[in-house]
Amino acid sequence: MKFLDLAKVYIRSGGGGTGAISFRREKYIEYGGPDGGDGGRGGDVWVEAVDGLNTLIDFRYQQHFFAKSGQHGMGKQRTGKDGAGVTLRVPVGTEILEEDEETVIADMTEIGQRVLLAKGGNGGFGNLHFKSATNQAPRRANPGQPGVERTIWLRLKLIADAGLLGLPNAGKSTFLAATSNARPKIADYPFTTLHPNLGVVGVDGTEFVMADIPGLIEGAHEGRGIGDRFLGHVERCAVLLHLVDGTAEDVVADYRTILTELQAYGGALATKPRVTALNKIDALDEQERAEKAAALQAASGFPVLQLSGVSGEGVQDVLRAVRRRIDGARQAEEATDREDTSWQP
């Protein structure tokens, strides 16, 4: 899946400082001549791909990035100080787009990659530059060049093979933390997860990327809760892992709530390959496990796996099932691509 996280950002490079109009004034020197220094250069605006980030959430709280302008020139041929630049730190996989959200300025695909977004203005010349044989005392200096101001979009594309679905507090983050190197926030209350978390999951010598999607509630496709903004991103997953809280009073109702949201959202979301699992079985006795798993299987029409993200019971079986579905989905996609690219007379 490709998570698209958009952020609108306003940037402005620094303007150049104005050149100085100044004359040498020293004792016993009657005609000192011009000594005005140049203005400092304005700061640049850069974007850099860094490690350790997987979201553009920081740009939600700060949208304006302005570099400093260069200082004005001074007497005694002193050049003004250059303005400080600004660097936007973004995750790898971020696209930089023009204001139209279509034209790509840069694609940040490697750690350490830097791209200049707005160049600072040059500083203006001081009057020292305008001295000539016919004008020994010029009273002229150049203003600095203005900075560049523009509006850009940042669009993050993170790749995940499988997405975790479930109601809030279904144990998705615990499962991801138990099976991968991800460390999502975990607590015993709903909506602990506020944005997707990615983790690399290993099983039987193979790896795939799994995303923990914020919990969905009834009416999420209409904008309720916090899951509506992620339903479109889940649509791009190859496989969905639907975790149902085994401690819930009615597991079938919980299952159908998520299924209804997928169907109401439209598209191919409801028909996407899906693995259903009964979670938190460590809190159930054998009879409760069997009854709830049977009810869930009858409602879904597919085999239902059982697991506990806390104790680890059944986790490997679930991962293997997800791995098989991912392989099947990729093979089907490759077959479709071959059909699309086949020559037609």
UniProtKB/Swiss-Prot annotation:
Coiled coil: none annotated. NCBIfam families: Obg_CgtA, PRK12297.1, PRK12299.1. This is GTPase Obg. It comes from the Bacteria. One of its GO terms (biological process) is ribosome biogenesis. Its cofactor is Mg(2+). Its main location: cytoplasm. It comes from Dinoroseobacter shibae (strain DSM 16493 / NCIMB 14021 / DFL 12). GO terms for molecular function: GTP binding; GTPase activity; magnesium ion binding. CDD domains: Obg.
